Design a protein with these regions (language model features):
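Short, basic phosphate-binding NTP loop
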Residues: 5-192
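The Walker A (P-loop) glycine that initiates the GxxxxGKT/S ATP-binding motif of P-loop NTPases
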Residues: 195
Length: 195
């Protein structure tokens, strides 16, 4: 029964995290994928409060989960369901466009979460080899993932930094492709090339 509650907690947590991450990536996209503009958007009055509100239930579910007991774990699952509802996508004038860049950002974020969970599980197991590892590993992973959940608005920065070489390579490919096409037309008079 406890395993089932852990699975439900993890599933509801992940769905809430994915919905919140989609909102964050949408805002990053609205700011033209520019970290400086996105940072300025974060600092606008009300945005931090709104973002914290979107993470509040997931963050409150953590102490309940760490306390243990079926009642606390069930309450933690209910709070995660509230997180899912709070992060329900709203109608936007300009909705999130699932470009290849957005997909790469989502995959990179998922990999960061998986690495953080794996590292926390392994370190918890190494530190407390005498204890029941599943309980300690699960709680440690839950703690690390909950902290990451709250930090998602700023996790965009390292994700963007990790993906930056890929994005530059893609941009370089298109520039080189345009230069090649122009070279194939020797009689063409080039006045200017725009984006």
């Amino acid at each position: 029964m406890d395993i089932l509650i852990w699975i439900i907690w993890a599933g509801t947590y992940l769905l809430g995290a994915v919905r919140f991450e989609l909102y964050i990536v949408h805002m990053f996209q609205q700011n033209s994928y520019k970290p400086k503009e996105y940072w300025e958007w974060l600092q606008v009055t009300g945005n931090i409060g709104r973002l914290l509100g979107k993470t509040l239930y997931a963050f409150i579910s953590l102490p309940l989960l760490l306390l243990g007991g079926r009642g606390c774990m069930a309450a933690a699952c209910l709070l995660n369901i509230m997180t899912i509802l709070v992060n329900k996508p709203r109608h936007a004038k300009k909705p999130l466009v699932y470009t290849a860049r957005v997909k790469r950002m989502l995959v990179t974020t998922g990999i960061l979460f998986a690495v953080a969970a794996a590292v926390s599980a392994v370190s918890a197991n190494v530190i407390s080899a005498a204890a029941f590892p599943m309980d300690i590993m699960g709680k440690t992973c839950a703690f690390v993932l909950s902290v990451l959940f709250v930090l998602l608005p700023v996790v965009v920065f390292p994700v963007n930094l990790i993906n930056h070489p890929i994005e530059q390579g893609i941009n370089r490919h298109y520039i080189n492709d345009a230069a090649r096409i122009l070279k194939e037309m020797p009689n063409l008079t080039v006045i200017g090339v725009t984006g």
